[in-house]
C-alpha cells in the first residue's frame, strides 16, 4: 500500500464532496474545485473522512493511488482554507504595488512590469517589498508565484530579485574572492 494513498482525508464542516465516474467535485466556503482522476480508483466517504482505494497492486494503480489522494486533499484544503505563497523583493528601489487587480513591479527594468492574475488567483501587497499570491487551487497559485519570481530571479552575486520568503540564495564570491585579493592574477 502507498503510505500517502492509504491516509484518510478529513473533510471539514461546511465542505461538500461529490464523486462521479472519474470526477471529484468539492465545494466549500472559498469556492468550488473539480479534480479528474482515473476511474479505476474509488473515492468513498466514511465518517467525515475520504478514502482513496485502488483495485489492484498493478504498477499503474500504485502510481496513481498516492497522486490521487494528494490531489483530492489539496482540493479539500483549498476550498476550506485556501493557499498563500509569500514572495519578497530584495534590491534598492525594488517595489510592488497593486494597480486594480494587477500587480505592478518596479524591479530595475526601464519600465514597470505588470502581471494580471488569472481567474481564481489574487495578489496582495502588505508592504512595498512583500507580495502574497493566494487562491484555492494549489497548482495555479504555485505556478503564478513562480511566474512572478521568473520576472527577476535572485541574482547570484548580490541576491537582488524576487524570492520566496525564507528562500536561501547561495551567493557567489565575485572578482575579489576569485583571485584571492588585490593585484594577484
From Swiss-Prot:
Pfam families in UniProt: Ribosomal_L6
InterPro entries: Ribosomal_uL6-like, Ribosomal_uL6-like_a/b-dom_sf, Ribosomal_uL6_a/b-dom, Ribosomal_uL6_bac-type
Gene3D superfamilies from the UniProt entry: Ribosomal protein L6, alpha-beta domain
One GO MF term: structural constituent of ribosome
UniProt GO BP: cytoplasmic translation
One cellular component (GO) term of this entry: cytosolic large ribosomal subunit
Lineage: superkingdom: Bacteria
Keywords: Ribonucleoprotein, Ribosomal protein, RNA-binding, rRNA-binding
HAMAP family assigned to the protein according to its UniProt record, in alphabetical order: Ribosomal_uL6_B
Function: This protein binds to the 23S rRNA, and is important in its secondary structure. It is located near the subunit interface in the base of the L7/L12 stalk, and near the tRNA binding site of the peptidyltransferase center.
Homology family: Belongs to the universal ribosomal protein uL6 family.
Subunit structure: Part of the 50S ribosomal subunit.
Listed name of the protein: Large ribosomal subunit protein uL6
Organism: Deinococcus deserti (strain DSM 17065 / CIP 109153 / LMG 22923 / VCD115)
Name of the gene: rplF
